[in-house]
Amino acid sequence: MSNTNGSAITEFILLGLTDCPELQSLLFVLFLVVYLVTLLGNLGMIMLMRLDSRLHTPMYFFLTNLAFVDLCYTSNATPQMSTNIVSEKTISFAGCFTQCYIFIALLLTEFYMLAAMAYDRYVAIYDPLRYSVKTSRRVCICLATFPYVYGFSDGLFQAILTFRLTFCRSSVINHFYCADPPLIKLSCSDTYVKEHAMFISAGFNLSSSLTIVLVSYAFILAAILRIKSAEGRHKAFSTCGSHMMAVTLFYGTLFCMYIRPPTDKTVEESKIIAVFYTFVSPVLNPLIYSLRNKDVKQALKNVLR
């Protein structure tokens, strides 16, 4: 881990989203507001579901975990990003490792938390008579624990592979947080193992979690089409509508980043897309789930009385 003159790299420089002073001031205010709204929204959702006993169900148990992951996700990047805008743009080697590790871990955790939520909706609509058995407290705890254990295990493995590389080309990271791809570009050692491990992990986790979601919704759609009454179909659709919107928002931004041909993927475009799944998704999820959910809206009214 040394630079071109042989001295050890003890810190990195994060270039951020822009080097324009006027835009930096605007971005600081914008992301500070977004972060505060994210904190308020996700903490509010967690507290609401803890306080109202009617929301002590498997669906809201998973939603509480999703809100917690989103809260940690945006908190991992925003404070450092805001600090870099108003002061020095540096981050220590250990700080960069920690941020990279937590980012990967929480990204993977969210993949499988959304998959667990899709399974919950599948059981509720496709097999309602066995819902209490298939989503017992023990099952729910296992389904919610797996994303954290797997996400933080694979995240640690990926982060260790990255920071075992030798960094000698530069200490400047063209991003607003310590991300794997720009870090790999700074390495002057062989990145074959790391690049392939990253590709395999990204491909497997994205495809496997999305497959669980799509298969679950295929069964849900089949069950809904068998419902004869229009009111029953509408109720079933509304039950999983919020989750479908959250999945579309989260996976949609990731596909925009990785599905395009490599020639079209500029660094600046990648940073802008990263803003969406780092900041936009966490701030919108509480709104999506509260505005389309009668139980949440009623619980909020009860608390505000």
UniProtKB/Swiss-Prot annotation:
Chief localization: membrane
Membrane side Extracellular: residue ranges: 1-25, 76-98, 160-195, 258-270
Subcellular locations according to the entry: Cell membrane
InterPro entries for the chain: GPCR_Rhodpsn (IPR000276), GPCR_Rhodpsn_7TM (IPR017452), Olfact_rcpt (IPR000725)
Signal peptide region: none
Keyword terms of this UniProt record: Cell membrane, Disulfide bond, G-protein coupled receptor, Glycoprotein, Membrane, Olfaction, Receptor, Sensory transduction, Transducer, Transmembrane, Transmembrane helix
Disulfide bonds: 96-188
Cytoplasmic topological domain: 47-54, 120-138, 217-236, 292-305
GO molecular function: G protein-coupled receptor activity; olfactory receptor activity
Topology versus the membrane: Multi-pass membrane protein
CDD domains: 7tmA_OR5M-like
Transmembrane regions listed in the UniProt entry: 26-46, 55-75, 99-119, 139-159, 196-216, 237-257, 271-291
A single Gene Ontology CC term: plasma membrane
List of glycosylated residues: 5
Function: Odorant receptor.
Family the UniProt entry places it in: Belongs to the G-protein coupled receptor 1 family.
Protein name, entry field: Olfactory receptor 5M11
Lineage of the species this protein comes from: Eukaryota, Metazoa, Chordata, Craniata, Vertebrata
Gene that encodes the chain: OR5M11
